[in-house]
Amino acid sequence: MMVVVDAPIEDTWRALADLPLQTVWMHEMASMTVTTPGPVRVGTRAEAVVRILGISVRDPVEVVELEPPVRYAIRHNGLFRGGGVITLEAGVDGTATIVRWEETLVPPILPELGALIGAPILRSIFQADLHHVARLVASGGVE
């Protein structure tokens, strides 16, 4: 998934790498609690409650890569396993940012079939989230 954000890479990074702020731009995320004290770093753990297709699920995650302001990756350690990587690239003139998001979630039951069926649904949800964060950052609504 990809979106172009009409804002510099530093502003876009601040919004995407702020774990608690994800509840603002990720429609399916009901809550996010960072359980590791201190600033976000590799090894930081958090727990989200997400609603997918009307079902609330705990989603414990761990930050596994952090390269400000260009790369951020998490591992899902709960019922659904997998990982997500968000990469940022400054636009040619520095006033825009290209954001790419790759996410793999494997359900606990019939994992291959569930991932195959669920992937298009989740891709649509996550693409909408990217457009939402792009609008928020571009409008200055996320600090």
What do the PLM-derived regions correspond to, one by one?
Residues 1-36, 41, 135-138, 143:
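Hydrophobic ligand-binding cavity/cleft-lining segments
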Residues 1-3, 34, 59-65, 83-90:
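Hydrophobic/aromatic beta-strand elements that line small-molecule binding cavities or substrate pockets
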Residues 5, 52-54, 67, 79, ...:
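A generic beta-sheet turn/junction motif
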Residues 9-10, 37-40, 64-69, 87-98:
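A short, structured loop/turn motif at beta-sheet edges
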Residues 12-16, 22, 46, 63, ...:
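Hydrophobic pocket/interface hotspot
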Residues 44-51, 71-78:
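Short beta-strand segments that buttress and anchor functional surface loops
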Residues 51-57, 107-110:
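Short, cysteine-centered beta-strand-loop-beta hairpins and adjacent loop/turn segments enriched
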Residues 75-128, 133:
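Beta-strand/loop substructures that line and gate deep hydrophobic ligand-binding cavities in soluble
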